[in-house]
Amino acid sequence: MDTGIGQDIMIRSFRTIEKELKNQEIPLDKKWALLHAIHTTADFDMENILYADPDAVSTLYNKINGGEVPTIITDVTMAASGIRKGALQRLGVEVKCYLQDEQVAEMASSKGITRTQAGIRRAVEEHPTALFVFGNAPTALMELCDLIRKGKATPAGIIAAPVGFVHVQESKHMVK
């Protein structure tokens, strides 16, 4: 089987990362998420800080492969860009980011919220059960958590890596 140069590089990278892990007894589903997180960030401290609900990774994997997750929503376009297109196509999954939507810009301006918050509000209106991926905006993650508490969203899963120094810790605590 010819995996291609890019796939070969990724596999070699994952093997290198796995050799460097301090804990070799990590459950397979969490290890998969951890390898990807370290590969993305080049930060081996992820081994100490990555949080995943028990069975969350395997449950989400089964949902995606079972066709139960037709849509992934991202807070920003860069997060959408980082999701492998070949896998999406193979699984029939669509990725959407509402950040550039005109209605989102209008909503953000009229409500006095960030565009990413407005984007999540709009996304939940159309896709309340999607998988939500946050690669930037803590305010968007907080918005989703509020919508979940209000019963307006029941995500298939949440993958959250908000950045910055404002609202980041609060958003991470809210999602737990």
What do the predicted segments below correspond to?
Residues 1-71:
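Electropositive, gly/pro-rich neighborhoods at or near active sites that engage anionic ligands
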Residues 58, 173-176:
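Structural recognition of alpha->loop->beta junctions
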Residues 60-67, 123, 147, 151:
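Hydrophobic helix-cap positions at the C-terminus of alpha-helices
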Residues 6, 23, 35, 68, ...:
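Generic structural signal for short, flexible, solvent-exposed coil/loop and linker residues
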Residues 76-148, 155-164, 168, 172-174:
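Conserved mixed alpha/beta catalytic, RNA-binding, or beta-rich assembly cores of soluble enzyme
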